[in-house]
Regions:
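Karyopherin-beta/Importin-beta family HEAT-repeat alpha-solenoid scaffold
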Residues: 1-594
Length: 594
């Protein structure tokens, strides 16, 4: 490796070494300390070479070597960290500066916090100085640079998250993000990093969260204003999603003035936008505000027209439930409505409560997208947890285009329950259905819903055109029978035997809506061309996780609840007759309960 005046060969050799070391690091393998030490002289030579590409490569190898050489190499790695930081501001080559910013992502996790924590402020200052000296405005030619800056800032902050309270770290991160808000990868990095930061700060108590809000709220609300003025929708979406993260992990109660700072912006967005990417996080932000500090929300008035808070949020919900907003954009309105009903109750909502519930039922009748349907159903499910009888009484007297509200809601509810996603949501739904069943209300039993799929075995593959001409046929069953069918299915899912959860199934159904000639054939082959991480691939081999591949894990709590229900239900009059109407497969599942 020591050929004078042949730097390109050295740089090529270092490139190969860098690749090999990264492969070692990816599989969590270390190189022997003696071998790592043997590279130090070469690295030192490269770091002082006149050729900037060789210097840059030397820093890159130094970083990955620090990660793979183990604790015995930390003293040398610490010297690399100091040299890297100096090069960011002191090296004349931009190539070297960018390489050093990237190398920090390798060096920081390779060293103990006793070394890296004192370096946080200097690193943030160096990255800030670099960012200020360069034009980071939107452009594909610098997208990679902005991603590198954001990742390095994220890793620096994560050494000790409190640094955001005493430094411009988040200002620099937001500046990088605002100049690349249309870059999905960059936005994802910044959003996920901010979520982690807010969670860590909020866990330290109210005082720390208040200081965080004082630091970031002016930037976030200002970004919404700038995005509106410049019509940069991507910037507005980013700011709204960061506000959502801030509210979601907020303290209880929220800091004084939080609602007054945030709600006017969110109200304007939710009443004026049709962009689904903007409406969803803004809706969730309002929902989290209600959840964390309903009293502060109630005390707020809309400044332009002087509307009280309840009226303001009811107008928002009414607009999102209306025909001008599609299913995708309105996907979170059900959660907002449910939160409002729970927090305000009939005492505060008064005559608005039945109007609100009727509007939810009306939109549920026409909803098509699974997440939106789930969101609306959960409004009634959460009310059922409190008073199932009142929910049935209300829906029975509601008229929806000539149909009983009970018929409309129960049909949609029971047909889509198997598609529910999210452990909390699934548990709420299961308990609500059990409460409905235990009412033993004749009005529920009179509602006819879709039962089992009628299998038509023609021996031929069914094309899409044939499926449209001859849609699937289902049996009709009473609602209380369908509840049992759903709960039997949920019992199997809670035991961890389900292969794919509802969200994945719904996604497959939506993919099948293209105008191709043939049905998609389900496959167990893993497509290695997909952009998934090694950890996700390993998780797939081990059975997956709900968040990764939509596979539901075993849920002992839910399973125990269902077991108790079936044990009690089986002793009641009429259950044996109901049992006889189940499919053989469903009967076997219940028999296996013992």
């Amino acid at each position: 490796m020591f050929f004078p005046n042949r730097w390109k060969l050295r740089e090529a050799a270092l490139f190969i070494l860098n690749t090999l070391l990264r492969d070692f690091n990816e599989v969590e393998q270390q190189v022997p300390l003696e071998l790592a030490t043997g590279f130090t002289e070469c690295i030192r030579y490269c770091l002082h070479h006149e050729q900037d590409f060789l210097r840059a490569r030397g820093y890159l190898v130094a970083g990955v070597l620090a990660q793979t050489a183990g604790e015995g190499f930390q003293q040398t790695a610490a010297s690399y960290l100091e040299a890297t930081l100096k090069a960011i501001t002191g090296d004349a080559s931009e190539v070297v500066q960018v390489a050093c910013i990237r190398v920090l992502q390798d060096l920081l996790p390779a060293l103990p916090s006793s070394i890296t924590q004192p370096m946080q402020i200097p690193i943030i200052s160096a990255v800030s100085e670099f960012a200020s000296a360069h034009d980071l405005r939107d452009g594909t030619d610098n997208d990679d640079l902005k991603v590198t800056l954001a990742e390095t800032l994220r890793d620096t902050i994560m050494v000790e998250s409190n640094v955001v309270l005493s430094s411009p770290a988040l200002d620099v991160l937001f500046n990088v993000a605002s100049n690349g808000a249309s870059n999905f990868h960059l936005v994802m990095i910044v959003t996920e990093a901010f979520e982690d930061i807010v969670q860590m700060i909020s866990q330290q108590g109210t005082d720390a969260y208040v200081r965080l809000c004082e630091k970031v709220l002016p930037s976030l609300t200002g970004a919404i204003d700038v995005g509106n003025l410049t019509q940069e929708s991507a910037l507005t979406v980013l700011a709204a999603d960061l506000l959502r993260a801030l509210a979601e992990n907020g303290s209880e109660p929220l800091p004084n003035g939080f609602v007054a700072s945030v709600m006017p912006k969110l109200n304007r967005l939710l009443l004026g936008s049709v962009d689904a990417e903007l409406i969803r996080p803004a809706t969730l932000a309002v929902r989290h505000i209600l959840a964390h500090d309903f009293n502060q929300f109630l005390a707020w008035r809309e400044p332009d027209e002087g509307k009280v808070a309840l009226e303001t949020v009811l107008v928002i919900i009414d607009r999102l439930l209306g025909p001008s907003v599609d299913d995708s954009a309105a996907g979170e309105v059900g959660q907002l409505a449910a939160e409002l009903v729970e927090k305000a109750g009939s005492e505060k909502l008064g005559p608005y409560l039945p109007q609100l519930l009727q509007a939810v039922a009306q939109r549920l009748a026409t909803a098509q997208e699974a997440p939106f349907i789930q969101s609306l159903i959960l409004v009634f499910a959460r009310l059922t947890l409190v008073s199932a009888r009142e929910v049935v009484d209300f829906l029975a007297q509601v008229d929806l285009g000539g149909q009983s509200g009970l018929n409309v809601v129960l049909s949609k509810w029971l047909e889509n329950s198997v598609n529910f996603a999210g452990y909390d949501e699934i548990k709420q739904n299961i308990i609500a259905l059990i409460k409905l069943y235990n009412l033993e209300d004749g009005r529920v039993a009179q509602v006819q819903v879709k039962g089992d799929l009628v299998i038509q075995d023609t021996g031929r593959i069914k094309t899409r055109s044939q499926a449209r001409a001859n849609p699937d046929q289902y049996t009709n069953v009473p609602a209380h029978v369908k509840i049992i069918k759903v709960l039997v299915e949920e019992l199997a899912s809670a035991s961890g035997n389900g292969d794919v959860d509802a969200a994945a199934a719904a996604g497959l159904e939506e993919e099948g809506s293209d105008d191709d000639d043939w049905e998609d054939v389900p496959s167990n082959i893993l497509d290695l061309s997909l952009g998934v991480t090694k950890q996700e691939l390993m998780a797939y081999g081990e059975g997956g996780t709900e968040s990764t591949f939509g596979v539901r894990k075993r849920d002992d709590e839910t399973q125990g609840f269902l077991l108790q229900f079936f044990q009690e239900a089986s002793t009641k009059p009429g259950f044996q007759e109901l049992f006889a109407t189940l499919t053989p497969s469903e009967q076997d599942k219940l028999r296996n309960l013992g």
